[in-house]
Amino acid sequence: MRKDGKGNGGSRVELQKEIVRVCKALNSEGVKYVVVGGCAVILHGYYRTTHDIDLLVDSSVENISRLKKAFQELFKSDEISEIRDADIDQYAVVRFAPESEEIVIDMIGKIGTIDFKTAIQDIEEIEVEGIKIPVCGLSTLIETKKGIRPKDKEDLLFLIGKKEYLGKN
């Protein structure tokens, strides 16, 4: 983990490699998740930086167990075991930043009114380096980005423009 608390957001190439690495591990364990936040915006084609990987996850005990197993194997770290099954539902964001890595992963149970069950109704599977990544669809991603932060406003302009260009409702 970097001492400044920022993840691997400095380089788009490095971040893409991290996203692929994380999603490959999650897919191999059958974890139910959707990429949201800045990484989802990037995967939809907007060039921006982000310092973390945001994952909207199914908060069932079985799924959290699979997620923890995937991260233990990927990062060779027991730090993930500190996260309790109920944490995803209890906290707005559960942050995992393995000591040995320059990566920050935010696990989220709900963004506003959007939970995993809602998000999977509108996902786009984007393939990167042969790995299928479930990414939050445009309409749902727009809903999750209706915040007041300047970067959310920039993301919204891009997402709404892309949605209009593609003619999606």
Positions of predicted regions on the chain:
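Compositionally biased terminal segments of proteins
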Residues: M1-N169
